[in-house]
Amino acid sequence: MTAFDKDQVSRFRFVRCDFAADTGVAQLVYAFDDGPEMTETVTVPGAPFQLDGDRAAAVQRALQLLHLIAGVSYYKAAVPAQVSIDSYAIDAATAALVETVYFNGLGEFAYRNGLNLRDRFKLPVTEPLSPRERGWGEGASAPNLNLTHHALVAIGGGKDSLVSIEALRNAGVAETVTWIGGSQLIRACAERTGLPTLNIGRTLAPELFELNRQGAWNGHIPVTAVNSAIMVLAAVVQGMDQVVFSNERSASYGSQIAGTGEVNHQWSKGWAFEKAFGEYVQQYIAADLNYYSLLRPLSELAVARQFAKTDFYDAHFSSCNRNFHILGERPVNRWCGVCPKCHFVFLALAPFMPKMRLVRIFGRNLLDDSEQAGGYDALLEFQDHKPFECVGEGKESRAAMATLASRPEWKEDVLVKRFANLIQPTLSADELQIEPLLVIDGEHRIPAALWERLRANFAA
């Protein structure tokens, strides 16, 4: 591979994409200028698949959407001003969705690298596309595919997806626990559920890692957007009518950066993405394919309260991000105890479960370790901004800490005592109440009949 100079790249190309029904393998091909092709593969287990008529056309539409969204991993290496699609045409609605994903989903990447990406990524639009060109037949929107009533539920190994899986089980929804990639931790968690599983393969183009070694731009991408597109493709291929994630309402709020404004590390876990993506899927891919987050009405603390109701997964789950880097070491234990995710999950669970149970899960008491003060200050938004991690809002951390400060078994721990002495006196008592943060919100895409079955359980 010739030397890569990101400043000399002028164009990013979506070269082509294809899906082989006999093997279940999707190939997503990209390139910079006239450089070597970069091919990512996604493998849906269960081949061969019988795909014809409307379903085959829907697979093609889902494949193109995945091709466009997954390209973010490669585009970011050089962020050139020109973009082309070599092998198919898209309309304005598709371009608008994907451009929104790139701009917002690369927000943290742009901030950390000092880049301004506003209006930079623009897709070529072909208007108008006829219903036949879209693969809709003669309809005004995507057809109903008569998909089987069955949910593909994303599992990430943490508490959130396990709450969703158990809620769907209790509601009588047929579900398959689904994950992407080779994490053994996630596999163990998935197997612990006792439900059918689907492990989708994803292999990034090896050239991408070489570009990174040669000085490409690198950083955070909207991975939930990519995983959502992968699972929509899998659902259409498998003939299932629901793709379920476990993103709570706290994900919609980012970090407030002085002089910059809001930067949301988890934008593609937020409501704006879920709404836009879910509506697009139903209008353009399959009318009866529902994409939604089961936990959208809940705060992080409300999810923690639900998780604490059972200890069935205590020895299996982990939200520690050090377990999930593409490259790099994994900790020997499931919780490193020093990253923002460990800090937040410990704090969020503390009000809702016995102290000894929580310490047993983590292997130690994180709130009785003075060296963790800086990490907790960031969660509390005390002299720092919320970390660029998938953690709850500052007000949730403050309310949880205030709750612990009032409890005999916690109030003598060094960081709880520090909060009570140093931080709590600067805050109003009203904003430290935990109960208002447990109230269910009305903004979600959960199918109405399912929500009626879930609502009472989530409120308690």
Segments from the language model and where they lie:
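ATP/NTP-dependent adenylation/nucleotidyl-transfer catalytic domains that generate, transfer
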Residues: 1-30, 37, 287, 308-460
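ATP-dependent adenylate-handling ligase core
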Residues: 181-315, 319, 331
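Glycine-biased, low-complexity coil/linker segments
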Residues: 133-137
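Hydrophobic/small residue at the entry helix of a nucleotide-binding pocket
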Residues: 160
